[in-house]
Amino acid sequence: MPKIHELSETLTNQIAAGEVIERPASVVKELVENSLDAGATRIRVDFVDAGLKQIVVQDNGTGIARDQVDLAFTRHATSKISNEHDLFKVATLGFRGEALASISAVSHVEILTATKGAIGVKATFSGGNKKGQEDAAAREGTQITVRDLFFNTPARLKYLRSPRTEIMKIVDIINRLALGYPSVSFTLSNTGKVLLRTPGNGNLKQTVANVYGRHIAEKMEEFEAKDNDFKISGLMSKPELTRSTRNFVSILLNGRYIRNFQLNTAIMDGYGAKLAARHYPIIVLAIQVDPLLVDVNVHPTKQEVRLSKEKELSRLITSTISNVFIKKTEQTSAFANLENKRETLVDQLQFNLNQNVVNTARKKTPEIHENNEKPEFLAKPKKPEEEKTDYVDLNIPREDDKYIITKTWDKNVLLQQDLRPFSNTLCDSEVISSGDETLANNLPQLSYIGQIDTYIIAENNSDLFLIDQVAARRRLQFEKIYEMLLSKKIVQQGLLTPIVLEFGNLDFIQIKDKIDQIKQIGIYLEDFGQNSFIVRSYPTWIHNDVEETIRQILDGYLNLDKGKSENLFKRVAAMQAKRDISGKINLAAAEASQILIDLRKTEDPYHDADGRLVLVRMSENELKKMFKRDK
């Protein structure tokens, strides 16, 4: 066995860097947290080549004294704790004194720093060794430049993800810190292109608007509560505004972004059954607590913590979120129309056996075209300068708001009406067609009897069928849209006024990366700057609320697993079918009969696209048992 010996400082720093510095985002996190601990109110982060080539973090904090620069790059040297007792009441984001030493061990680092009223100093480090130091002109604060990350540990480079993924991890880190410190102005840029800029005015809602987009911030509710040990506050999305992953749940404990299963569960319990299955809210939850109740020294990244009185905090979170919905319900109830009368059972019974079908003629529409080539309906609006708007102000309209479609969009949209292809003549009660023999479907031929409320009553031999007309119409609409998407023959309709869609920086990056795939469903997006896209036309299978529909489609696409285009087509068709068929309508006998015919032609006549039952069958034997005539 070789002799035991002490490792060199350079080697120990490289080993420590393996735990602290996993990827470029780790460097950004450590440096920005140092800036926040130094009291900075303005922080700028620039990176090149996903952070591997260069990362620059500049702040206006207190700076580092010239005689302490060397000490700052020494392992376990810190100004944030002094003894073992301080470890149990950590009030800063960093405290171990490992970051700068670990970063300099695997890169080339240059630091330019100055304290108030003092001459600045510039020092350089490479591979954990100091290369030089000199006086330099500098403002109060610190600027650290990291170049050629992992230059001396090439094996680490093989385990990094794609440049796009590494960029998104950097963006996510800054987003979380910006949400945790709305009083600090953050600027993040990639090779000179600004990805995020926040005002630093302490307005959390405005910060959310810059991080996630104004359309999301406007749909979020404020909350605040406290007990003897905890104070919580933040913003939460309404139940209809969700995501299919937990990535938009930000829990900030004394400004530190943490991951905690029990607190996540408390948030979900607060929403209860208001959320759809496997959907999660967008929420920024800020928790203020005495540092004595928190142990942050349990994980290298400090994202996992140990909390005293965690159950009490969970109850506070759940009850606070629930109370937001209770208050909203009370406000809504106050304006409810109390004079609405319940329909009588007689009014609900609709046996339309001999009703005629109204012949509705199609309206003429402007000339339309297929999506073989991208249309040019209008001249492009002038693109805004990249640096024109510093940040999103919810109280000041954007200059390009004139391009945004508002609730009166229908005045500017030339719609092609899409009517149901029902026959003009009265259909016979027996649902039988000469072409139906080719249907190898196990749904039998049904004879229409009548309707009660939202249900169609039909029979086959001695069996009785109840068909939910809403679910049935959704199934038919789903099949129609899905077949259109598969055929790639999607008709476009031009917009008289283009729509500008704003997104958060992460969403913008993901959508831009998938623009070509999104074109397959007939949605053409153009980069319009400031994390926004412009839309000049839309597919005619979108019948109303064009802007909101496109937003929902893109939101769903962000969380779509990689796979075949059919997966996207099915999701889009199912979502649009649900939007098109929102409730029951009064069906003529011929229309109801046509639904029964068309159901037999579908892939699954028994369920709609969301898996809900379309029909229920009651056999003659079951009916006899119900009436005790089985003997």
From Swiss-Prot:
InterPro entries: DNA_mismatch_repair_CS, DNA_mismatch_repair_MutL, DNA_mismatch_S5_2-like, HATPase_C_sf, MutL/Mlh/PMS, MutL/Mlh/Pms-like, MutL_C, MutL_C_dimsub. Coiled coil: none annotated. It comes from the Bacteria. Pfam families: DNA_mis_repair (PF01119), HATPase_c_3 (PF13589), MutL_C (PF08676). One of its GO terms (molecular function) is ATP binding. GO terms for cellular component: mismatch repair complex. Keywords: DNA damage, DNA repair. One of its GO terms (biological process) is mismatch repair. Belongs to the DNA mismatch repair MutL/HexB family. HAMAP family: DNA_mis_repair. This protein is involved in the repair of mismatches in DNA. It is required for dam-dependent methyl-directed DNA mismatch repair. May act as a 'molecular matchmaker', a protein that promotes the formation of a stable complex between two or more DNA-binding proteins in an ATP-dependent manner without itself being part of a final effector complex. This is DNA mismatch repair protein MutL.
